[in-house]
Structure formats: C-alpha cells, structure tokens
Amino acid sequence: MKEVVKLVLLGERQNSLNLSLYFNKYPPTIIYPEVLEDRNKKLASPSGSQRKISLLVLNQGVLQFNKIKETIEKSLPIETKVKLPQKAYELYKKYYQDYTDMLNSLHAITGKFKTQSRLVVGLGDESVYETSIRLLRNYGVPYIPGSAIKGVTRHLTYYVLAEFINEGNDFYKRAKTVQDAFMKGDPKEILSNAKVPERCSRLCKEFLRIFGEKKVPEIIDELIRIFGTQKKEGEVVFFDAIPIAEEIADKPILELDIMNPHYGPYYQSGEKNVPPPGDWYDPIPIFFLTVPKDVPFLVAVGGRDRELTEKAFSLVKLALRDLGVGAKTSLGYGRLVEYV
C-alpha cells in the first residue's frame, strides 16, 4: 500500500498524475491506506465521506499525505474543480493533434461544441464510488463516446417521427413503436400512413428543414442509411467527442457535483409498515464527478456520402442542443451547443 502512495505522490510532484488511473485504480487508498481493509484484513466498502475525500483530492494529489487528517478536521477546504496536470496536458495535446489529423484524413465533418450545463457520461459504470464518469484511459480526460452521440441522435428522430403518426394519445408509446420498427429494419409498414402534422413542433420544423422537400418515405430511407438497423450497419460513423486541447489548458475539466436522495428506506424496504416519504427521512449525499459548463468538445461524423453525412451532423446538433447526452438529461444535464 505504501508503494501505491509513493507512486501517486510521484505523479503529483511531476505534475503528471493520470486522473483516469487514479480515479479508477487507487481510490480511496490514497487518503487512508486502511480504508479498504477492516480489522480482519478483508475488503471493506468506503463510506460516503471517504468517497467525497477521494474525489476532492483529485486536484490536490494527496495533499501532503501526513496532513490529511488535519485537513479533514478543517472541513475539507479543498478545491472542487479539477484541471489537467501540465505534463498530462502536453501528452493529451499531442493525442488531440493526431486525432484531428485522422478526422481530416477521413474528410469527416467536425464542429466545436460547448457544454451549456454540467455533463456526465458513464455515471452508472461499475465503480467503487457507486458513481463513475467516462475518462480516456491514457489521458484522464472526459469524453463522449460516439455510441452515445449516435444513440441520442437516433432517439431524436424517433421523437419527431412519433409526431407523424396518430395512433393513440400516448406520445412515448408512439415513439417506442417507431423505435421498434426501425430496429427491425421495416419502419415503412408502421409509418405507411405517416404524414407531417398540421401543428408541427419547433423541433419537427427544424428536422424537416434538414431533409428539404423530401416526403416521409424518402426521409425514412435516409434515416435507415444513417443509423442502420439490427441487420444492416449505418453508412455514417459517429466519432468520440473529445475536449478541444488548446481551449482547456487552464480550464477545469472536472468538478464535483452532488445528488441527495432522501427516501431510500421507503423505496428499498420490503416491509409494509414503512413510513411514506416525508421530512422524517435523512438525506444521503452522494458525490460524483461531472464536466463543468463551458467545456469545449470536438464533435465529428464521417461517411462516404457527403450529403448524407451533412444531414447526420445537422441531426447531431439538434440532439445535443435539445435532448442532451449522458446521464441526468431530464434535469438539464448534457446539453451542448455549436459555436464558432
């Protein structure tokens, strides 16, 4: 365990601590080597406060290991925003250049997007913290997987096409019907009578502008070509979105957030006489890492058919702006807007 501490101390002193490896491999042994071992030398789960300490300490290395207890007693006066260490930034800058060179060689369509709210992708990934975040393993930088971007863009099309059918009043059931039809690869049967509604939503109008004067069946054909089905791969590649290197040199790329569930005993208990949700339950703070507002990302899509790829990119812009990507989007997280 002492070797682990020495390793992280060395990384901090050299300003090259890999945030991804630290976050996933060493918590919370950096704070208290004894945290993961109980008196019987068995693995023990860290408490909420210990998780909080481990998250906060990302920006401070190990805060002079022998002074941690004193720091804790002073209510953790630790910066809750995390910048990329200088040496790690230099390595990431080189990776970013290689990545953009690759995109250019493929003639991908790229755009700069900035987070309009906090962003967290991979919140439910397996982690000793109970919460997680998706980081580039070798660089400790948050990113948005291309699969996540493709998924939210595809769902945007389901929501819009759900406006085109009039089977029932439940909008989300209609959207699910559209989704099932697309996944099976035969949406035309379900959408054979689909038509643009007279009262089209703002999102619907922007969606239709992307496809011009095309009729609904032609739009469906192009969507199948973009996203594919269970039997056929799509013709457009959705690349991972990564932070723009030159714009994050002195900008925090991670910050601490908190969720505060109150009624765990009511929902988790199998007993019948448990008191209903109310003020008599205690909040249980759960700390987790997010990407702050105003962090720039490079978003890219590619494909052989340039016109089809441009339409896919336009759909991505709508999806990131209106639906958001990652976890907690219903609370406003994960919104990104293109900028110049």
UniProtKB/Swiss-Prot annotation:
Keyword RNA-binding found: yes
PANTHER family: CRISPR SYSTEM CMR SUBUNIT CMR6
Keywords assigned by UniProt, alphabetized: Antiviral defense, Cytoplasm, RNA-binding
GO cellular component assignments: cytoplasm
Role summary: CRISPR (clustered regularly interspaced short palindromic repeat), is an adaptive immune system that provides protection against mobile genetic elements (viruses, transposable elements and conjugative plasmids). CRISPR clusters contain sequences complementary to antecedent mobile elements and target invading nucleic acids. CRISPR clusters are transcribed and processed into CRISPR RNA (crRNA), formerly called psiRNA (prokaryotic silencing) in this organism.
Classification via InterPro entries: CRISPR-assoc_prot_TM1791 (IPR010172), RAMP_III_fam (IPR005537)
A molecular function (GO) term: RNA binding
Primary localization: cytoplasm
Biological processes per GO annotation: defense response to virus
Assembly: Part of the type III-B Cmr ribonucleoprotein (RNP) complex, an elongated RNP with Cmr2 and Cmr3 as the base, with Cmr4 and Cmr5 forming a helical core along the mature crRNA (39 or 45 nt in length), while the complex is capped by Cmr6 and Cmr1. The 5' end of the crRNA is bound to Cmr2 and Cmr3, while Cmr6 and a Cmr1 subunit (Cmr1-1 or Cmr1-2) cap the 3' end of the crRNA.
Subcellular location as annotated: Cytoplasm
Domain of life of the source: Archaea
Protein name: CRISPR system Cmr subunit Cmr6
Organism, as annotated: Pyrococcus furiosus (strain ATCC 43587 / DSM 3638 / JCM 8422 / Vc1)
Pfam families: RAMPs
Entry similarity comment: Belongs to the CRISPR system Cmr6 family.
NCBIfam families reported for this sequence: cas_TM1791_cmr6 (TIGR01898)
